[in-house]
Each structure stands twice: as C-alpha cells, then as structure tokens.
Amino acid sequence: MGAPSPDQDIAAIRRNYQRASLRSVDLEADPVEQFRRWLQQAIAADLQESTAMVLSTFDGKRPSSRTVLLKAFDKRGFVFFTNYGSRKAEDISAHPNVSLLFPWYDLERQVAIMGPAERISRAESQAYFSSRPFGSRLGVWVSQQSQVISSRQILEMKWQEMNRRFANGEVPLPEFWGGFRVAPTEFEFWQGRENRLNDRFRYRPQQDSNHAQTWRIERLAP
C-alpha cells in the first residue's frame, strides 16, 4: 500500500476540547462585559494577536473575509481602521451588515459578533492615527489598498517619496483613511467541549418591561 493521500492526513487531524466549560450561570448579563472578560483572559494567556478578528463583508454577490485588528470597543460597538477605498470599505458602504470573529484557538473558544458597520468621527480617527508609530502613519499614505500594482518596487519608491515629504515627522491623517464601528445586534460565545458537545450561547437584544434594552441569552445546540 502507498502512502496516505494528503486528504486522508487532513481528515485524521483532530483534538479533543477539554480546557474549559461555559454554563449559563457563568455568563455576564451584558455581552460586551462577557467579551471583555474573555478578551482579558486571551491577553493574559499571551495568545498571539489576541485582538485579531476576522471581518466578513458582502458585495451583493459574494462574501469576503480578512483579518483586521480590534482597536477599541464599548457598548456602542467594536472599532477597526482601514483605507476607505479598500474592498472592505466599499462593501460596507453598500451592505453595512458584517460579522466579526475572534478565533482564540489555544483557549478552544471563539466569539462571533454581527451587526451594521458605520464610519466613526474624524476626531476619533485622528486620535488613533496620532498614536500610531511614524512608520505606520507613513504606510497609510504609501498604499492605495486593494489596487493592482506591478511590483513591490512601486511601494518602496512611494515609501521613499512619502518619507521625504513628511521628513519632519508630522504625518497628517488622510481623508481616505479612518475607522469603522460595528454596532452589535447579535453575539455568540462558543467554548469547545469533549466529544464535540460544545457550549454555545447567543445574545440578542430585547426590551424589558420598562422598555429599556436588555439581552436575551439562549443556549444553542452544538
């Protein structure tokens, strides 16, 4: 018999999830606070890129996904930054509903967040842009994100040009760059469990008897 095919090798790859459990009594009533707790645990575990999230958008015909970095969050939503001429920004302009996925594999857990995205204020974008290192601010001016280029040399030449242009270290925030905030309408917290009997809890908004917004929590079958 010959060696197993690559597909057979892949099919045999599996692990049994046993690190933790997630019970309804463990959950915060507010999903933002539940997310905060899990994010703090991911950071404390020294996970690589613990603030990385997979952003999925839709252009009207097909979805697309990419990894971006979470830069702020509160009860209003979850913030990331990008070029406003990028594919993701164009998708959001036409179809604002997106999803975010935080895949914390080493903790055998993930968080999915769904909701519409919209641009944040220029003042908020300016505050974050000013906090970035010089090279990161310069890079924003260098790259026309998602545009076809003939070679890497184009980027390197543009870098030198921008480096000369902003040699004094003062790099302004360009009009074509800034943040988006995703306002959550649904959360799902997933914790891997033994024998694939994983724990899943979904949060959806509801109104209480005083017409204040609260969150309905439901356990989902794995």
From Swiss-Prot:
Binds 1 FMN per subunit. It catalyses: pyridoxamine 5'-phosphate + O2 + H2O = pyridoxal 5'-phosphate + H2O2 + NH4(+); pyridoxine 5'-phosphate + O2 = pyridoxal 5'-phosphate + H2O2. SUPFAM superfamilies: FMN-binding split barrel. Its cofactor is FMN. Pathway: Cofactor metabolism; pyridoxal 5'-phosphate salvage; pyridoxal 5'-phosphate from pyridoxamine 5'-phosphate: step 1/1; Cofactor metabolism; pyridoxal 5'-phosphate salvage; pyridoxal 5'-phosphate from pyridoxine 5'-phosphate: step 1/1. FMN binds at residues 66-71, 81-82, 87-88, 110, 145-146, 190, 200. Its EC number is 1.4.3.5. InterPro entries: Pyridox_Oxase (IPR000659), Pyridox_Oxase_CS (IPR019740), Pyridox_Oxase_N (IPR011576), Pyridoxamine_oxidase_dimer_C (IPR019576), Split_barrel_FMN-bd (IPR012349). Substrate binds at residues 14-17, 71, 128, 132, 136, 196-198. GO terms for molecular function: FMN binding; pyridoxamine phosphate oxidase activity. It is an enzyme of class 1 (oxidoreductase). Keywords: Flavoprotein, FMN, Oxidoreductase, Pyridoxine biosynthesis. It comes from the Bacteria. GO terms for biological process: pyridoxine biosynthetic process. Gene3D superfamilies: Electron Transport, Fmn-binding Protein, Chain A (2.30.110.10). Catalyzes the oxidation of either pyridoxine 5'-phosphate (PNP) or pyridoxamine 5'-phosphate (PMP) into pyridoxal 5'-phosphate (PLP). Homodimer. Belongs to the pyridoxamine 5'-phosphate oxidase family. This is Pyridoxine/pyridoxamine 5'-phosphate oxidase. The lineage of its organism: Bacteria, Bacillati, Cyanobacteriota, Cyanophyceae, Synechococcales.
